[in-house]
């Protein structure tokens, strides 16, 4: 059954008329073994985490933009690292970002006006002299510019987790970028989005 579902969604990705069939197949239930429910971030903790980076410092603006994209787009940290200026389509009627996922598959993710504001502010500071193929988030070591590492993204996330922890002791002990993705997926499901559509954001989450 899992193979049939995967095939139908593969076809539906290229043919929108097949999506209703794929969604119907996804509702066929089958017996599962017991799975451990993975941690997510509670709404009040999440709000504090996203608000933690300062809007008055260069680094704070960068860090807030990273956290917002990880959550709002529900993207993997590897996909965040692949983003370039050319990935961003901020001036379209409906702004969106081209995200390169696993298997070099590209998908289009629409973004809110508020996220556009954060991105434009970040770009004005960090990309005043770069061209379109530069990494959106980068580090410069000995004059060499390269995409920010996964380790750096994790350190940024946990830096702000520790900052708010005294007032938010319920935060998981250690946060990972994928936890923001999982939290976003769970939030969508709780707001009425079809489970199969949510699970295509995060196949490994248990909702």
How should each PLM-predicted stretch be described?
Residues 1-207:
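Conserved catalytic core of the tyrosine transesterase superfamily
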């Amino acid at each position: 059954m899992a193979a049939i579902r995967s095939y139908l969604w593969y076809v539906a990705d290229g043919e929108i008329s097949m999506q209703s069939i794929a969604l119907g197949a996804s509702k066929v239930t089958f017996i599962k073994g017991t799975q451990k429910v993975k941690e997510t971030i509670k709404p009040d903790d999440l709000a504090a985490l996203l608000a933690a980076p300062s809007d008055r410092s260069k680094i704070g603006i960068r860090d807030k933009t990273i956290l917002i994209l990880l959550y709002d787009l529900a993207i993997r940290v590897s996909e965040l690292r692949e983003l370039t200026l050319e990935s961003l389509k901020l001036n379209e009627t409906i702004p969106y970002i081209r995200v390169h996922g696993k298997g070099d598959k590209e998908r289009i993710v629409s973004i809110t006006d508020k996220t556009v504001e954060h991105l434009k502010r970040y770009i004005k500071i960090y990309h005043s002299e770069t061209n379109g193929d530069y990494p959106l988030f980068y580090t410069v070591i000995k004059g060499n510019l390269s995409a920010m590492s996964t380790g750096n993204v994790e350190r940024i996330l946990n830096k702000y987790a520790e900052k708010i922890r005294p007032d938010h002791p319920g935060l998981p002990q250690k946060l990972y970028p994928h936890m923001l993705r999982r939290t976003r997926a769970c939030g969508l499901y709780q707001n009425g989005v079809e489970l199969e559509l949510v699970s295509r954001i995060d196949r490994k989450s248990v909702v």
